[in-house]
Amino acid sequence: MALQAATSFLPSALSARKEGAAKDSAFFGVRLADGLKLDATSLGLRTKRVNTSSVAIRAQAAAVSAPTATPASPAGKKTVRTGNAIITGASSGLGLATAKALAESGKWHVIMACRDYLKTARAARAAGMPKGSYTIVHLDLASLDSVRQFVKNVRQLDMPIDVVVCNAAVYQPTAKEPSFTADGFEMSVGVNHLGHFLLARELLEDLKASDYPSKRLIIVGSITGNTNTLAGNVPPKANLGDLRGLAAGLNGVGSAAMIDGAEFDGAKAYKDSKVCNMLTMQEFHRRYHEETGVTFASLYPGCIATTGLFREHIPLFRLLFPPFQKYITKGYVSEEEAGKRLAQVVSEPSLTKSGVYWSWNKNSASFENQLSEEASDTEKARKVWELSEKLVGLA
């Protein structure tokens, strides 16, 4: 299963504080951008918000100015400038592995979009990501206001946005009752689909304005939402039905918490959200590829059986699932390998085809995979798009 690590959805430990000509502060070897000040309390680290116009947080030694084009070579030709890629959920798992692979290439600056600054800063240092190769900006996909603020903060960096990777996800397979986002949506669909939908729509103009040779929007999919596969047929199967739950708001009060209007099932909610992700990618392609030149793609990088996304599963599952994938199904891939595969979809010239769902064979070669009938239903994609626009306030 192409499952991505997702962090807990508690409020962030950081918020921005505007102080005029504030000086940079150092904390655990990480520099905070202008406008941030930390207070230590018995409960941990906090900031006090004075002005809601927050600014982005920079990694240690990262320059505030955007990467620029490389000067002309002796032959008189300009080389391609460093690309800038936003990755959601980059503090662990697939997101962190992808951020590391891109940063280590020397060709990319990574904007790590995460809820917890300190966790992300420590993870980047532990992974050995080069100093100056990344910027950490707060994003909580369980809040549409946070998504909008993130877009404002990223634009304050004055960097062109060349690639957006929608990777973060929440998975609650053992939950008996639904939990909800700040906006009242069932958590899995609210974070995995609606939060990313708003983010991608808001950043589309930035991608369109990019002068990078190959600008891309990538939404991580999952084999579990693809019912034309063996894994996709493991109960409960993904099924969006007639979208009656989505149309009613997924709030579990005046409507069902599930997209199809059925009773809540945490595992199915995740799978349904991944179907929405794959439908959304295709609808982006149909609506905007020709106009913008942006490549829209999804992928299944392989089964990352050790990912932290399984932390809410029962202990026996967490114990047995990795060896089962390694030795029985042979579908296991490490976080490092999966990160390299996602980095390929970000940067490889051979993977520029738009509207594609990428997978890898046993020889680690990429290929265009087929989607199930539901995950490729153009009419359902249109309906999901239009309902999502209303739910996130774009229509």
UniProtKB/Swiss-Prot annotation:
Source taxon at top rank: Eukaryota
Family annotation (CDD domains): LPOR_like_SDR_c_like (cd09810)
Coiled-coil annotated residue ranges, if any: none
GO CC terms of this entry: chloroplast
Record key words, sorted: Chlorophyll biosynthesis, Chloroplast, NADP, Oxidoreductase, Photosynthesis, Plastid, Transit peptide
Gene3D superfamilies documented for this protein: NAD(P)-binding Rossmann-like Domain
Interval spanned by the transit peptide: 1-59
Keyword DNA-binding in annotation: no
GO biological process: chlorophyll biosynthetic process; photosynthesis
Enzyme Commission code(s) on record: 1.3.1.33
Protein name according to UniProt: Protochlorophyllide reductase B, chloroplastic
Organism: Hordeum vulgare (Barley)
Gene, per the UniProt record: PORB
